[in-house]
Regions:
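Glycine-rich anion/phosphate-binding loop at the beta-strand->alpha-helix junction
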Residues: 44, 49-55, 61-64
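Short acidic, glycine/serine/threonine-rich loops at helix termini
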Residues: 30, 55-61, 127-132
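A glycine- and small-aliphatic-rich helix-loop capping segment at beta-alpha/alpha-beta transitions
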Residues: 36-39, 59-72, 134-138
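Condensing-enzyme catalytic core mediating Claisen C-C bond formation in acyl metabolism
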Residues: 73-149
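Beta-strand segments within the central parallel beta-sheet cores of soluble alpha/beta enzyme folds
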Residues: 16-21, 42-50, 112-120
Length: 149
C-alpha cells in the first residue's frame, strides 16, 4: 500500500512494487529497482525500506527468542554484531529511501551522483531463519551473482 500511496501523492508513474523480506527489504528493493533500470523498464526509481518492530508484540517475540542484547546498562556498546562477545542485537526502528537512476539519465539532467551500483545478487542458505550456514555458501553465491550482474 505504501508504494501505491506514494505514487498517487507524488505522481510517480511506472513500475510500482512493495517487497517485504524482513531485514533484507531495503536491499532487495535496491536490487529489484536496479534490475528494472538495467532492463529499460524505468529510467529512475524511488527505493527504500522501513521497519517498525519496537512494538509490544515485536519486543515480546524477540525477548522470547532471546535475540536481544542483555547489555542494557551500556546501550551505546550493546550492539556489536561481529564481536566474539556479542549477545544479541539492539532493537530499533528506521527507514531509508534513495533515488536510483540510469547513469546516462542522471548525467543528462545534471544530477549529483553519490555512487554507482555495479552489481546485485541475492541467495538463501536454506539453513536457518537468521543464522548463515557455517560454510557461507549463500553469501558466496550472493557475491558471485553480484559480480556477474
Amino acid at each position: 500500500m505504501i508504494s501505491g500511496n506514494l505514487s498517487i501523492r507524488f505522481g510517480l508513474k511506472g513500475p510500482n512494487i512493495a517487497v517485504t523480506t524482513a531485514c533484507t527489504t531495503g536491499t532487495h528493493n535496491i536490487g529489484l529497482a536496479s534490475n528494472m533500470i538495467l532492463n529499460n523498464q524505468a529510467d529512475i526509481m524511488l527505493v527504500g525500506g522501513a521497519e517498525m518492530a519496537a512494538s509490544p508484540v515485536g519486543l515480546g517475540g524477540f525477548c522470547a527468542a532471546r535475540a536481544l542484547s542483555t547489555r542494557n546498562e551500556d546501550p551505546e556498546s550493546a550492539s556489536r554484531p561481529w564481536d566474539a562477545q556479542r549477545d544479541g542485537f539492539v532493537l530499533g526502528d528506521g527507514a531509508g529511501v534513495m533515488v536510483l537512476e540510469d547513469l546516462a539519465h542522471a548525467k543528462k539532467r545534471g544530477a549529483r551522483i553519490y555512487a554507482e551500483l555495479t552489481g546485485f545478487g541475492m541467495s538463501g542458505d536454506a539453513f536457518h531463519m537468521t543464522a548463515p550456514s557455517e560454510g557461507g555458501e549463500g553469501a558466496a553465491l550472493c557475491m558471485k551473482n553480484a559480480l556477474v550482474s
